[in-house]
């Protein structure tokens, strides 16, 4: 999510436009982290990682979570023989209570996604944009809509169905 790290939602607008083109042909697997890159919480911080997760769960595609991201795991990928060790730690038998707040947010976003199954084919349309703030709507094939407000200055996200707030973080 370089658009969050670089504080440039115009980059995200371009990416979502390209993503819409993919959705015209197939439903892509979407992710914000994987086993080959520095962890999202390390790249953009834990609070900003929540904004990235909100995007992941409100755009078209099949969202995937890299284990530990839902707990805010950190890890820097390095360019050496053991460079993947920090991003691929053993999964603990029990999660730390320190990551519970992030896990609860992920659970809420997953629940929102499950309540709106049409999102997997949703196209996005940017309604308002500035470098550090963006509002877009995700529109399903049947005309269903959710509106997403992202703000990097306040580090906040709101997801609405019409006037009803479905999710809020700040």
Regions found by a protein language model. Give the residues of each.
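Carbohydrate-interacting/catalytic domains
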Residues: 60-65, 69-170
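Conserved alpha/beta catalytic core and glycan-binding cleft of carbohydrate-active enzymes
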Residues: 1-82, 89, 151-152, 157
């Amino acid at each position: 999510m370089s658009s969050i790290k670089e504080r440039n939602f115009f980059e995200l607008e371009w990416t979502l436009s390209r993503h819409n083109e993919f959705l015209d042909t197939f439903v892509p697997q979407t992710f914000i982290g994987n086993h080959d890159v520095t962890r999202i919480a390390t790249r953009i911080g834990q609070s900003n990682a929540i904004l990235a997760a909100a995007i992941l769960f409100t755009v078209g595609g099949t969202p995937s979570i890299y284990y530990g991201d839902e707990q805010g795991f950190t890890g820097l990928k390095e360019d050496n023989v053991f460079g993947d060790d920090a991003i691929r730690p053993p999964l603990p038998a029990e999660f730390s209570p320190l990551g519970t707040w992030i896990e609860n947010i992920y659970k809420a976003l997953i629940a929102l996604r499950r309540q709106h199954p049409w999102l997997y084919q949703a196209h996005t349309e940017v309604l308002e944009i500035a470098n550090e703030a963006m509002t877009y709507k995700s529109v399903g094939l049947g005309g269903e809509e959710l509106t997403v407000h992202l703000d990097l200055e306040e580090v906040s996200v709101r997801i609405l169905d019409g006037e009803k707030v479905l999710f809020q973080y700040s």
